[in-house]
């Protein structure tokens, strides 16, 4: 039996002048791990930005724990963790300070989990480096460490295994296995295929390409 939904999406419309991405999209996100599945160009990353409240839909509603993204955007966004790969906002920030910012923004931030993630993802040598100095894979590890520690109701992960080494992939898999048993938090994982051996709360098929 599914636990009560944390995030409700109803009649979501979003597109660009030359392409409609979503026309009347509706679904619910329940505690555990949900796969947002689709190929290149189908709008997976755009949908994550919509769910994060980083961009607004043309119409439709998004609610987390009955908080509307349109009516209470600040309260809505405070319940979401989302690290936008295209953002340069933290490029000059050290890894340690980035974690401090995330801790200040998320009331449920778990310092013990952060310490485990720093060790599990091999981030100790990079703690005092600015993000712009990091490789793509290491920067992705920083975002993942914050994601697993944040304690947010909704955590959004965009292709989390990309550019990771073997030990880091194993660590992420273990954390997602734990996340699948969550009763109060949801992880939304955007990827082409489901990660092996992870019990999914649901699968949302976005499609192979944009409409």
Which positions does each model-derived feature cover?
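A short, flexible loop at the N-terminus of ABC-type nucleotide-binding domains that lies
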Residues: 1-31
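Helix-to-loop junction immediately C-terminal to a conserved catalytic motif
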Residues: 52
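Conserved ABC transporter NBD signature motif
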Residues: 57-76
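Conserved ABC ATPase "signature" region
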Residues: 111-126
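Conserved ABC ATPase signature
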Residues: 130-137
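Hydrophobic anchor residue at the start of the ABC signature
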Residues: 144, 148
